[in-house]
């Protein structure tokens, strides 16, 4: 029984030791994203669009009035994913 308790304690210490560097990396990534230069007004956004998923013209004017957004991690309720956005080195869902 003592052996089991000692092994469990060692496991918990090992997991905690691994969690701290992970949290540090997450903090560094967040800090890097917050340091977006404001002096460069040019932003590059790359979109990948799948035409087979495009809404059909069964409802006139649907495409003209459709609003699309790049979202993480997924589309909101009522939206549909039509492709992928690549922005700031991350992959976003292209939702309409």
Curated annotation (Swiss-Prot):
Modification after translation (UniProt) = ADP-ribosylation drastically reduces cytotoxic and antibacterial activities, and enhances IL8 production.
Give residue numbers for the modification (Phosphotyrosine). Answer: 87
- May I ask which residue range the UniProt record assigns to the signal sequence? 1-19
Which SMART domains does the entry link to?
Defensin_propep, DEFSN
Pfam families recorded for this chain?
Answer: Defensin_1 (PF00323), Defensin_propep (PF00879)
Q: Where in the cell is it found?
A: Secreted
Please list the residues that make up the propeptide. Answer: 20-66
Chief place of localization: secreted
Entry GO CC: extracellular space
- Has keyword Transport? no
Question: Which PROSITE patterns is this protein grouped with?
Answer: DEFENSIN
Q: According to its UniProt entry, what is the function of this protein?
A: Effector molecule of the innate immune system that acts via antibiotic-like properties against a broad array of infectious agents including bacteria, fungi, and viruses or by promoting the activation and maturation of some APCs. Interacts with the essential precursor of cell wall synthesis lipid II to inhibit bacterial cell wall synthesis. Inhibits adenovirus infection via inhibition of viral disassembly at the vertex region, thereby restricting the release of internal capsid protein pVI, which is required for endosomal membrane penetration during cell entry.
Family to which this protein belongs: Belongs to the alpha-defensin family.
What is the name of the protein in this document?
A: Neutrophil defensin 1
